[in-house]
Structure formats: structure tokens, C-alpha cells
Amino acid sequence: MKEPNSAEQSKPEQKTQRVASHRLFLDDIEHQSFVRRLQWSPDGNFLLTPSACYYDLQSEEQASRSNYSYTVYGFLKHNMSQPAFMLPGLKTYATCIKFNPFLFEKPWAKPDQVPLFDLPYRMVFAIATTDQILVYATDQQTPIAVIGNIHYAPINDMTWYSNEVLVACSSDGYCSIMTMTKDDETNLIGKRIAPEALEDETLRSHYEQLDKVDYDKLE
């Protein structure tokens, strides 16, 4: 039999570290809605996904299957293997995400304001949950508007009408129309960027087509 040498005897025992893992999304039992509407950003750089859940993996007790928070995950187009960021703090799970199709000028930022993305323009999107709608902009990490108590059932879909009006529909059979204006002169989401101001040729061509839509004819 081979006798262990002194080096092997003095070598400390190595503990096997278990890599904690968890799911990213709710299953069909927990997500009791007809839809999971994810969407790409207007510039095509990232994808936002609803029905997401986040686990705090600091301890095994916290990482239990029933102990999670509702969130929305963002995936960058060049790396879809894992989320690049998340938007936590949702009271209930997200069912639908809808981007405003236009790009906007960035407002003057406060010194302590941390952007969600450092972009030369501002993008606006709405997140619908079972009982709320949260409107975000990419130049800040907190919502610019939170709307609640407007439906008796989960919100199934949303759409932007022009650049200031958001329409949401619910399983209760009703639609809600929300305007993003404080008064006649103040717009919550900012001023639209003119197509000719965009440096990216693909984006400029896309927004030139959007700019030709006459929304007054639809009223």
C-alpha cells in the first residue's frame, strides 16, 4: 500500500461548492393569464420579457421555490444566454410589455439620476401587470408613471396611439385610454426626435416611415 507523503497529509480538504441555480420565468400554474407579450426595443438592441421571477440566492432558505420577487428581464441582442438587467419591484407578475415606437429627446438629467441605458436618445415603454401599468424611460431606473385600479382582471395587451396615448385592454372586456400629458404644454415622455436627426441609417429610414402616418385621420 502506498503511504501518503507529508505534502499530501498537509494538504487541506477541499469542500465541494454547489452552484445555485433558479428558473427565470413563472410556470403556467403561477402565471394565470392568457398571454406573455415580450417585445424588442425600437432600436433593436434589447428584448424585454414579462412573467419573470427573481430569487435572492444568499441562502438556501431565501432560494426556495416559493420565495421570489416579480420582475422583468432585459436581454441584449448580442448575448441572449442570460439577462443583462432587470426591473424589480413589481407587486404582481408582468403580462405585457409595449414600447412606444418613437425615439425621444433626452430631458435634462438630475445629478443623482442613474440611467437604465446610456443612449443618445430616450425610449419609453409600458409594463402591464395584473393590476398596474408602469411606464418607464431608458434614461432613468424608476417609473415615470404608475397607473393602477383601472381594471377588474389582468391586462392582456397594450398599444401606443401616436406618441402620447397608451391604450390597454383587459380580460374584463374593457379598454383604458391614458394620455401622457400633465397639461396642454407638458408631456411626460418628452419631445420626439426628428428622423433626420438620427445618425443610424436604418433607424432613420424606419422613423421616416412612421413620421408619414397621419393619426388625425384615425380619429
Could you say what each language-model-derived stretch is?
Residues 1-81, 85-96, 179:
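WD40 beta-propeller repeat blades
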Residues 26, 83-105, 142-162, 194-204:
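Conserved blade-ending motifs and adjacent loop-strand segments that build the rim/top face
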Residues 30-32, 39-43, 99-104, 116-121, ...:
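Loop/turn segments within WD40 beta-propeller blades
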Residues 79-83, 140-144, 184-189:
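Beta-strand initiation motifs
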Residues 159, 164-194:
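Blade-level signature of beta-propeller repeat domains, shared across WD40, Kelch, NHL, RCC1
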